[in-house]
Amino acid sequence: GASGFTGRQTVRYFAENAPPGKVRWAITGRNQGKLEAVKRQVGGVAKDVDILVADSRDQTAVDAIVSRTRVMLTTAGPLALYGSAIVDACVRFKTHCVDITGETTWVRDLIDRYHNRAAADGTRIIPFCGFDSVPSDLGTYLIVRHLQRELSVPCKEV
């Protein structure tokens, strides 16, 4: 949510960079008090941003937010615990979803469960948009490069 380390940085970024009047955004999380504290800390444009409260374990509350959202950016982790309900709602409501996970097993499960429906509907589910994914991405890249250069093994897909 917006009250965690990455969430606070994201709120600050949007407050400082979102074009006024062109991008409508809100701060979301489980705890109203913590979200209000983030707004106060960030100040500026953030003071006028709506707060939407939902626990990701409450599918009805998640649905209420996602159903009125075009793009959901989630920074609450671990996403294997807190993100599945959000992605499920995003696919059902055709809301694009971006997350910061580095949890490859969870993402594999998401692909298996949601890719076909999301792709058919034009919904973008974009995981691995944070630093957590760098070690996995770099490790995968180095393994593929080694297989290709040292062992002459082609790699069509990872």
Feature annotation, model-predicted:
Residues 19-34:
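Conserved glycine-rich Rossmann-like NAD(P)H-binding loop of the short-chain dehydrogenase/reductase
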Residues 40, 52-82:
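Conserved Rossmann-fold cofactor-binding substructure of NAD(P)-dependent oxidoreductases
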Residues 38-47:
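Short, conserved SAM-binding/catalytic segment
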Residues 78, 87-108:
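ADP-ribose/adenylate-binding Rossmann-like module
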Residues 1-17:
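N-terminal Rossmann NAD(P)H-binding glycine-rich loop of SDR-like oxidoreductase domains
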Residues 126-132, 136-158:
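Conserved anion/nucleotide-ligand pocket segment
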Residues 83, 101-123:
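Rossmann-fold NAD(P)-binding glycine/threonine-rich loop
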Residues 28, 75, 100:
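The conserved SAM/SAH-binding core of class I Rossmann-like methyltransferase domains
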